[in-house]
Each structure stands twice: as structure tokens, then as C-alpha cells.
Amino acid sequence: MNCLTDCDGSCCKIKKSVRAGLKEEGYTMYRSEAHFSRALLSVLNLRVPFVQRIESGVTGSGIPDIWLRWVPAEMWVELKNDSYVSINDAYWKIKWRKGQQAWAQDYRISCGRITYTIVAMRDGFIIVPMNKRYINNLVYQHDVWRVTKLQDVLSILKDESIKINFN
């Protein structure tokens, strides 16, 4: 569900006037991570040969939400939704749960590959490469890609999948 087109305001704390202004400017906002996930999966399923949503009650602590497979590349992606912040903010405090950054670092060290966190914000998306530990979960503009369209998220992930070290 897109908070700008399908929401009456009861699902979130975003003022109707703010929501209307963002909609007018062409931004997309999601009321939950699940709604963001569905929208992203609808784009990924059209362009990525294999996409698997992993998150469930039985997966281990820290495992990302989605696994993508391009031949010969593969990629793990964690999803977050924070409609109270902007892609133009100077920095963001990402709501990683305990173990998520540790899992990403263990995977990077053992497999030589980077996982990514995609955060849906009120006016776009940031893509965070998990190539280091972010102290206090703080991420700065120079650490991320900032985009306003889901299709651009896919383009960046695809470009990054080519750079992955398979040794």
C-alpha cells in the first residue's frame, strides 16, 4: 500500500497536508516495511531472474529480508521503512535490529560479498552498502546512494552486483 495514494491517514502519523504535498511532487511513501517490500518485489520480479523473500519467524538473527540472484551474482538485501525522514537529511539513524550489522560483516568477511540495506523514506530511498560497521547505526550522505524511484534502486543493485568479488 502506498501511503500517498491509498491512505486515509489512519495508518500513520503523517499529516494529510504533508502527504498531499509529497504526492503532488511525485514522491512515494509506504506505511510499513511490508508494503515497501511488496512494491520493491513487484519491480524486482520483473527484472531479476530469482528473487526470494527470506524473512520469517524461523530464520536466524540478522539474516536480511531478500535474496537476489543474477547469474553469476547473488545479493542479500535488508529492507527498512522510515517515513519520518528525508533522503536530503545530513545523516540517518537506521533501525537495524541486534545482529543485523554483525551478520552483514560476517558474510562480507567469509564470502567476500557486500549486503545492502534499502531504506524507504518519505521522499525516496537510500541504499546503504554494508561494507563497514556503522557506529550507533548512524549513516551519512557520503555512505549511501539516494534515489527517488524504485527502478533506480534496481539499477544500482544491478550495477553493484557486477562489482562483487567471487573469489
Task: Enumerate the language-model features and the residues they cover.
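Short, charged, amphipathic alpha-helix that recurs within catalytic cores of restriction-modification
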Residues: 89-117
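Beta-rich catalytic cores
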Residues: 62
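Conserved catalytic cores of phosphodiester-cleaving nucleases, focusing on short active-site segments
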Residues: 66-68, 72-84
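Acidic-basic catalytic patches of nuclease active cores, encompassing PD-(D/E)XK
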Residues: 3, 12, 16-58
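Cysteine-rich micro-motifs
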Residues: 9
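Short, electropositive alpha-helical surface patch
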Residues: 127-149
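Nucleic-acid nuclease catalytic cores
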Residues: 108-135
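Charged phosphate-binding loop/patch that engages nucleotide di/tri-phosphates or the phosphate backbone
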Residues: 16, 22-23, 143-167
